[in-house]
């Protein structure tokens, strides 16, 4: 894998993007069209930062509607208005994690070829020989590709697969066989499992998030009528590419799924903004090298300038590859060849090194912070991963979780999904789990501890759910781990639709 001269590559990408969008109405509105892309980079970036704000999808669409004075068109028709953000009509739109749609440029569509090359690189590093009949399988959440007004709308992975040139070998799944699953995530999972059961012997590489693997394992076990490992489903699997997601909370469960298989795990990060990072050193799990030579420009905003909903504050400081500081946490923003300028990924990363530009993916930017407690998924994942190691001797695993905030009770409301029915577990153990999570959060978070100490936050209440309890219906768009709805309504919906046991943590103080 080649990725040298990070700063020079980023300067080149930045100038290229500015030159490409110069004649667009969006560039005129922001002031980016007035910039001289041949100017020295430090001065150019400073001027750019003054005129172009970092924005999320809602802010982008709001600006585009102001420019066009169009309050009624759908997002596809709006974005494809002539000369608005691009010089050509976009033919591919991908769904964001929150259910919006965003145009994909050619760079993003072709990134699956980079991932295929990366898998070959990983196999060479591990001395794994792949035959011509061996296949890679890509998992994604929604199967259908919808056609609207000259454009295809789908999950990014589905669009990438659909746009692979005819003369190249196409990875799995076979799109035409899963399209009938439509927009249902559950039906898409069923369709993918159908293909895995038919073609599993030829699959040697699996590209999927930890969450997708856990969901797949639950469905596979339901079909078999017992807990089932992947040894029979994917007998020749050698490489798992952990696709854009945190792993540790599911580590023990996934290890049990791969029992009897010699599977090597590597990590990647891929966003519909065009951001792509790969674990180039197979011995350094989670350390990802951003691909800075692919026509994408990265910006970094310190997390202290991001609110609890993931929105970047207007006063935010902004850094580029040449000025970013190692060992600090940032929210990444991206500008790309599609004409999107400084769009936030809403992902928090820790920068490891500047050249090459390496990061560790931590979490989504959203957090629970109404009591100034700053409870986020990275912290919770670490706590639950540590607790799962203790629970291993009891044959108990916390498989998944969701936590929200009840403003009336001033406490967090949790739903914890266990690997077995809570009715089969001693209540003393369940109560201990609740108290242990609360105590570990107090020990590991000054803000959580302070909120408890000042009585702005009361001890949490936790609903213990059986296996599959957080998969009985599809989660709202964008919800994973943290429930930002009013008074934890999503968490309560899961609790009310499950047989569950409820426990409240003791009022522990950490001195």
Question: What is each PLM-predicted segment?
Answer:
Residues 12-16, 27, 31-93, 99-106, ...:
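Active-site diphosphate/adenylate-binding microenvironment
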């Amino acid at each position: 894998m080649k990725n040298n001269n990070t700063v020079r590559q980023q300067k080149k990408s930045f100038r290229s993007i500015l030159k490409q969008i110069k004649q667009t109405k969006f560039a005129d509105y922001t002031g980016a069209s007035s910039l001289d892309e041949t100017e020295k980079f430090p001065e150019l970036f400073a001027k750019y930062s003054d005129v172009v704000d970092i924005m999320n999808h809602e802010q982008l669409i709001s600006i585009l509607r102001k420019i066009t004075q169009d309050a009624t068109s759908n997002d596809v028709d709006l974005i494809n208005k002539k000369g608005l953000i691009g010089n050509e009509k976009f033919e591919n739109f991908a769904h964001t994690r929150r259910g919006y749609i965003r145009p994909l440029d050619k760079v993003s569509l072709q990134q699956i070829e980079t991932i295929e090359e990366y898998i070959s690189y990983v196999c060479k590093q591990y001395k794994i020989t792949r035959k011509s009949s061996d296949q890679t399988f890509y998992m994604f959440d929604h199967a259908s590709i919808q056609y609207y007004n000259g454009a295809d709308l789908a999950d990014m992975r589905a669009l990438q697969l659909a746009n692979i040139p005819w003369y190249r070998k196409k990875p799995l799944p076979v799109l035409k066989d899963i399209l009938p699953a439509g927009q249902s995530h559950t039906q898409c999972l069923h369709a993918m499992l159908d293909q895995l059961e038919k073609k599993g012997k030829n699959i040697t590489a699996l590209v999927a998030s930890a969450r997708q693997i856990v969901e797949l394992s639950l469905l596979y076990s339901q079909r078999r009528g017992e807990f089932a490992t992947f040894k029979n489903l994917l007998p020749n699997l050698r490489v798992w590419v952990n696709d854009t997601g945190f792993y540790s909370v599911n580590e023990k469960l996934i290890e049990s799924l791969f029992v009897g298989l010699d599977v090597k795990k590597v990590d990647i990060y891929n966003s519909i903004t065009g951001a792509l990072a790969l674990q180039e050193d197979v011995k350094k799990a989670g350390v990802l090298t951003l691909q800075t030579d692919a026509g994408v420009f990265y910006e970094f905003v310190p997390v202290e300038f991001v609110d609890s909903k993931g929105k970047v504050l207007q006063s935010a400081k902004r850094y580029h590859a040449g000025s970013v500081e190692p060992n600090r946490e940032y929210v990444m923003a991206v500008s790309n060849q599609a004409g999107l300028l400084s769009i936030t990924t809403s992902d928090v990363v820790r920068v490891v090194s500047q050249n090459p530009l390496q990061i560790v993916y931590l979490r989504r930017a959203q957090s629970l912070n109404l009591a100034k407690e700053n409870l986020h998924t990275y912290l919770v994942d670490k706590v639950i991963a540590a607790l799962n190691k203790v629970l291993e001797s009891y044959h108990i695993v916390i498989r998944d979780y969701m936590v929200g905030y009840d403003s009336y009770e001033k406490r967090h409301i949790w739903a914890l999904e266990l690997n077995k029915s809570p009715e089969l577990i001693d209540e003393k153990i369940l109560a201990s789990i609740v108290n242990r999570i609360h105590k570990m959060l107090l020990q590991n978070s000054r803000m959580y501890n302070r909120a408890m100490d000042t009585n702005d936050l009361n001890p949490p209440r936790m609903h213990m759910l059986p296996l599959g309890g957080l998969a009985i219906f599809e989660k709202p768009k964008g919800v994973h781990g943290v429930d930002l709805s009013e008074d934890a309504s999503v968490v309560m919906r899961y609790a009310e639709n499950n047989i569950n046991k409820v426990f409240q943590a003791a009022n522990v103080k950490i001195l």
